[in-house]
Amino acid sequence: MTKFSQNIDYLRNKVFVPGVVLSTLYSPGLSAKTCIIKYLDGEVRKILCPTGLKPGNSVLTGIEIPIALGNHLLLKNLPLGTDIHNVELYPGCGGKLARAGGTFANVIAKEGSYVTLRLPSGEVRFISKYCWATIGRICEKNNGKKALYKAGQNRWIGKRPHVRGVVKNPVDHPHGGGEGRSPIGRSHPVTPWGRIALGQRTRKSKRYSDLLILSRRK
């Protein structure tokens, strides 16, 4: 995906420097659109475009600023029920969560040093109240539902043709080999590296962040 490097500003660290949306752009390597922001000091950056943000609108990053579309704030300053995207996992690391087209997280509770968020996957977890997030939902709400009119549309976003393991040679895949249309010869499908596929959970056990997850993803 280095071919489609976008240089998108996920950190949004221009604190208290107003910016104006110049235009919205289609980005071939992303499922969401981006927009060009020109800040008051003359710097130009590209950010993810939330639904409803149009050329001429202003955006701002700050601690106690208006709750407006496209503004970037600390989680502790967001009211309950706010839809957000580009959410940090740890303070100062840049947005990591809810960045795909049509996705958003929701602020559902505040307690102590943590804010409780419902993520796009359905997972409910604690995140530090000192993490930053951007207000609004990512545009392209029909992401994943549009019918493709040519194979090249998948190639634009980095998806290449997928070959089934059962039609490969046994040296290339555990499902391979046999005469004609033969079964895989196993009780359960596996990955090319021999691990159980289709339903097996791959998250490592005993991770430190397990204590922060209230409800696992659906």
UniProtKB/Swiss-Prot annotation:
UniProt similarity note: Belongs to the universal ribosomal protein uL2 family.
Primary site of residence: plastid
Organism field: Bigelowiella natans (Pedinomonas minutissima)
Transmembrane segments: none
Subunit structure: Part of the 50S ribosomal subunit.
Alphabetical UniProt keywords: Chloroplast, Plastid, Ribonucleoprotein, Ribosomal protein
Gene Ontology MF terms: RNA binding; structural constituent of ribosome; transferase activity
Annotated Gene Ontology cellular component terms: chloroplast; mitochondrial large ribosomal subunit
NCBIfam families linked to this entry: rplB_bact (TIGR01171)
UniProt-annotated stretches for the region Disordered: 165-192
Pfam families in UniProt: Ribosomal_L2, Ribosomal_L2_C
Protein's GO biological process: mitochondrial translation
Protein name stated in the entry: Large ribosomal subunit protein uL2c
Disulphide bridges: none
Superkingdom of origin: Eukaryota
Localization per Swiss-Prot or TrEMBL: Plastid, Chloroplast
